[in-house]
Structure formats: structure tokens, C-alpha cells
Amino acid sequence: TQIRSGKHRASIEFFADRVPKTVQKIRSLLPATVPLCHAKFVGDELMFMIPAVIDPEYLKSSIETGDVLYYPIQQTICLFFGDTIVPFGRGPFNAVGRIVDGSADLRQLAKTIVHQGFQWARFTQSDASAEKTPAPLSERTAEIIAERQTIWQTAPLELENLKSLQKGRAGNAAVRVYAFADAYRNQRNLWLLRDGVKHENITVETAKLLLAPMLREMADRCDIWALSTPGRLFRKAAGPPAEVTNSEELVDLLDELLIYNNRWWLWLDSCIPWFDLDVQLQNGF
């Protein structure tokens, strides 16, 4: 399996014996164009999102150079290519593979991406015979998937409007950061609910009671930042949960909400000049 961006490439060996369900799911998505980002808090790590929520299969207590991890909460594959590794959070970590070639290329890419926000990369698998997972037939999940596919490679129109939106004396910088923080909070809350349903710590009926007001709150916050499309989608999704009758349907819905929200979160992340802001702080702002 390879990840390519421009002239740079890296080869990944996935642990098919340790994480068979993960590998099967990933292969069903390939080939794919993915946003390759720098994990700013961690150090020598690049990561990219895939449109799939996959439960952990193989956990390890620490991270080493060359590790490839999958982070279910934000549907990201994480590539640890260098010696500076500061895990953002405690283990155990969901290990899915190893970098077998191309660490130097990833190091060069990281120097550009850390200031640029992200770069597009091509994620491919030499085995073209992998079966494709059929798309969910639910009308609710189908609409969310369609919206996610629309913004997967094309920046949402609302993102440009956000870059000039002003809120009082705080100006535009605060608008971008607050919108980003809202999306991050949404992701954590959706994941906690999904995790509770998946492991039967929360009943389906209780989860539905929690999800509806959660989605309406998410929609209201989107309206504040003039993000009309996700606001409309979240508000519409707040109605149907009462029709969900079992945990599988609810997890499917939550998975698609997680993927869609996280794609928005990454777009919002890309429009914040994190390192320019940091320079100002270091200069005594």
C-alpha cells in the first residue's frame, strides 16, 4: 500500500493477520484521494483521513518510529516517520501497520505541510481485487454520505465566507478558532455516544434521546458561523433518530455523522494560520 503526494511517496505494510477487519475496510476504499496533514501536537507525524469508522483490533502500549496507527475518533491513519514522537494522549494505541519505505520523503513533505495546512495525496493498493463495501441504503446515511463526498476534495463555499466573517471586536481570527473548536467538540461528543451504544453501555432509546438535542445544538452553532450546509444537515438528522430501531442502524448513522463532521473539522483546521499565530505569541503578544 502506498501514499503519494507529488514526487514523494511512502510504502505501508498493514498487519493483515492482526487487524484483518481494518485491512479489509481500508482496501475497500482504495484507491482514494486523501488530505495529508501534519499532526502539530505530536511531532514527526503525518496523518490523513479516510471515510470509515473502524473499531480497534490490535492495541499497543507505546509508539515507535515507523508505526502506523488508526485513530477511530477522527478516522485518521497516522504515520510516525521520525524520532520526535510525543503522543497526544495516553495509550493503548491502535496499531495497524508499519512504514516500510519512504520515511525521508515523509520528512520532506512534513516541512511543507506544517505551514501549508495540508496537501492532497493518493492512497493506493496494488491488489485491485479487493471487494468494495456496499453503501448504506438508509436515506439518512445516504444524504450524509452525499454531502461528505461533495466536500471531500472541494472546499465548502461557506469556508471562504468564514474567512471574512466578523463577530464584534473579536474579528475574524476568533471566528475561525471558535468554529474549529465547535467541530472538535462535536466529534468528541458524537464519539462518546457512538462508543456507548457500540459497547452496550448506553441503550438505543437513551442514545436517541441524547442525539436529537445534541444535533440541534450542533446546528445552532453552525448557524452562528454562517455554516449553512452542515447546520441544515445536522438539524435534519435530529428528526429521524426516533425511527431508528436497533443499535446497528444507530451506529451506522453516528459513523456517517462522525466522518462528515470530521471532514469539516479538517477544512476548518486548514484555514487557521496556527504557526503565524504562535510567532505573534512568542514575540510577546
Residue ranges and their predicted role:
Residues 1-8:
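N-terminal intrinsically disordered, low-complexity, charge/repeat-rich segments that act as generic
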Residues 14-285:
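Glycine-rich active-site loops that engage anionic ligands at enzyme catalytic sites
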